[in-house]
């Protein structure tokens, strides 16, 4: 997890300069190779051209830094249908969306919530859960959250 944070910290100023948001970073081994996956977004949406451009820019910064000592594959992508929600900004942006939230500890004997994201205020998320109705969850209690696509 520390490596992911190092990657985010290195690339955050570059992303800001390029007017994009880093939505999520993953760094893991796949079929014996290290893979750095970086999900990006911007207000007007991400194109293939954006991904190509950011791949070149991020790749150069990662190669110049000493963060990734082993060889790696760099993948740049849009967040997709099941976009991860990690920041307060992302929760606020997707108020009204169907959301899946998993918590570190049970809230009302429940750790998994699915429903409409109603609000984010004072470090608390309010969701209209399909099972228990309106539930408030501390931002710090969220293990994982993502948009749930209606397909």
UniProtKB/Swiss-Prot annotation:
**Quick check: keyword Oxidoreductase in the entry?**
no
Which keywords accompany this UniProt record? Cytoplasm, Ribosome biogenesis
Statement: the UniProt record of this protein carries the keyword Phosphoprotein: no
Q: Which Pfam families match?
A: DUF150_C, RimP_N
Q: Where is the protein localized?
A: Cytoplasm
Stored InterPro entries: Ribosome_maturation_RimP, RimP_C, RimP_C_sf, RimP_N, RimP_N_sf
| Gene3D superfamilies listed in its UniProt record | Ribosome maturation factor RimP, C-terminal domain, RimP-like superfamily, N-terminal
- Signal sequence, start to end: none
Classify the source by domain of life.
Bacteria
One annotated Gene Ontology cellular component of this protein: cytosol
GO BP term, example: translation
Function noted in UniProt:
Required for maturation of 30S ribosomal subunits.
Q: Which family does it belong to?
A: Belongs to the RimP family.
Tell me the protein's name. Ribosome maturation factor RimP
- Organism, scientific name: Endomicrobium trichonymphae
Task: Specify the taxonomic lineage.
Answer: Bacteria, Pseudomonadati, Elusimicrobiota, Endomicrobiia, Endomicrobiales
